[in-house]
A protein has these predicted regions:
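Non-catalytic signal-transmission and effector/linker regions of two-component phosphorelay proteins
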Residues: 1-24, 28-38, 127-144
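Alpha-helical interaction/dimerization surfaces of two-component signaling modules
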Residues: 35-43, 112
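Acidic, metal-coordinating helix/loop segments flanking the phosphotransfer/catalytic sites
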Residues: 37, 51-69
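Conserved phosphotransfer microenvironments
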Residues: 56, 71-89, 95, 108
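Conserved phosphotransfer cores of two-component systems
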Residues: 63-65, 89-95, 116
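Two-component signal transduction core modules
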Residues: 70, 121-122
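As written
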Residues: 81, 112-120
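Hydrophobic/aromatic residues positioned on beta-strands within the core alpha/beta folds
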Residues: 100-102, 124
């Protein structure tokens, strides 16, 4: 018998039960990435696979429908987070699995990415935004 599957939120491709959730961060800050790597490892252990890319072009090869959560810095060098957002969708990453990160005020982010265009927009520096982000992570990791 084949592996059991659950229907993902996006309904695009099945998600294997028991497989680690694939979380990808595309950001120019290695320190920011290491802080999230530590949080994910401590909070979820082997339930999460974390990948970090500084170069958005290199990240493109890793993107596909098997991504559980894609975190994109809006202020990426080269072509920016908005462009990577569009390219990720073109590679099969569901918009409901993409979170936009920025140091801009949340109100500005919501104007650039209205409700429903992505899973969430998160200000990197506001603690209440970080708490909301942890709730999103909990939901994704514990969903299946």
């Amino acid at each position: 018998m084949s592996e059991p599957y659950l229907k993902p939120v996006s309904a695009e491709h099945p998600v294997e039960i028991g497989r680690p959730k694939r979380v990808i961060l595309v950001d120019e800050s290695a320190l920011y990435a290491e802080s999230w790597r530590a949080v994910l490892a401590c909070r979820y252990g082997p339930a999460v696979s974390f990948e970090f890319y500084r170069d958005p072009i290199a990240a493109l090869d890793a993107l596909g429908p098997d991504v559980s959560l894609l975190l994109v810095d809006l202020e990426l060098p080269l072509f920016g987070g908005r462009k990577l957002f569009e390219l990720a969708k073109g590679r099969g990453v569901a918009c409901r699995r993409i979170v936009i990160l920025s140091s801009r005020p949340a109100e500005d982010l919501h104007q650039l990415f209205p409700d429903g265009s992505c899973l969430a927009v998160i200000n990197k520096t506001e603690s209440n935004q970080q708490n909301a982000f942890l709730m999103i992570l909990d939901s994704i990791v514990k969903r299946h």
